[in-house]
Design a protein with these regions (language model features):
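Membrane-proximal envelope and lipid/glycan-remodeling enzymes
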Residues: 1-245
């Protein structure tokens, strides 16, 4: 919703929805950079001679909703935990029992490898064992990432003109997001343990739609990827709610 209203140049709603998302997933604060860039770009499209300072003076009220939501979160955190930035995460068992804290560079390598690991093979040709937490092969669980990476490379070669800033910004934000996630002690449950990673998908999907090539071949290839991704996540949903994984 934040991205949708940003593209509609409705900054108040865009920043308010972004604040809601950050309240749930603080790491999504990174994408505020993208939203502000797009809002400035949209303003300058309507006002070619306009400046960032003029935008601030004219649209200052855009931050009211965002600020109100942020203050409400901080007030709730203070009332519950005596700290405006603490929302209960540090009180979870996995964080109270560790000496290395919630975030630490020592987690980075292992967590990155978790996002590459394949399902474990069963003994004597038994069934594959899928992980239910802390990540697994991102390209297997969300094959749309394959399309996103491919489209980015295509656009870098074919569509640089007029897109260069976003072609640089989006992957940098995604990589920064990934590194922050992987410096977190846990990668979470659900979506085969890829829940945190999937938070970046709306923003990457925006890039995909913006840069994708035209033509039937692109559609045909992605139909195969769509069917594969849908099938494995349908199986995962059934398996999860039946407590098979």
């Amino acid at each position: 919703m934040a991205l949708y209203y940003t593209l509609q140049n409705k900054g108040g709603l865009a920043l308010a929805f972004w604040a809601c998302a950050v309240g749930c997933r603080p790491m999504l604060a990174l994408y505020g950079i993208l939203l502000v860039y797009l809002l400035v770009k949209g303003y300058k499209k309507e006002n070619p001679k306009g400046t960032v300072w003029q935008l601030v003076k004219e649209k200052w009220y855009w931050v009211i909703g965002c600020g109100a939501i942020a203050i409400s979160y901080m007030a709730l955190n203070y009332a519950r935990f005596g700290n405006i930035t603490e929302f209960g995460h540090n009180y979870l068992p996995e964080f109270t029992r560790t000496k290395t804290g919630q975030f630490n560079l020592s987690y980075l390598r292992e967590n990155l490898m978790h996002y590459l690991r394949l399902p474990a093979a069963g003994e004597n040709g038994g069934a594959l064992s899928f992980f239910s937490s802390d990540g697994m092969a991102f390209w297997l669980i969300a094959p749309i990432f394959i399309t996103m990476i491919g489209v980015w490379i295509y656009a870098l070669v074919k569509k640089r003109e007029g897109n260069l800033t976003l072609l640089i910004m989006l992957p940098l934000l995604a990589v920064a997001h990934l590194l922050i996630i992987c410096c977190h002690k846990t990668l979470g449950g659900w979506q085969f343990g890829n829940r945190y990673l999937l938070d970046m998908m709306p923003y990457l999907f925006f890039g995909l739609v913006l840069w994708k090539p035209k033509g039937e071949k692109f559609v045909q290839w992605n139909t195969v990827i769509l069917v594969f991704g849908f099938a494995i996540n349908l199986i995962g949903t059934v398996a999860t709610y039946n407590h098979w994984i």
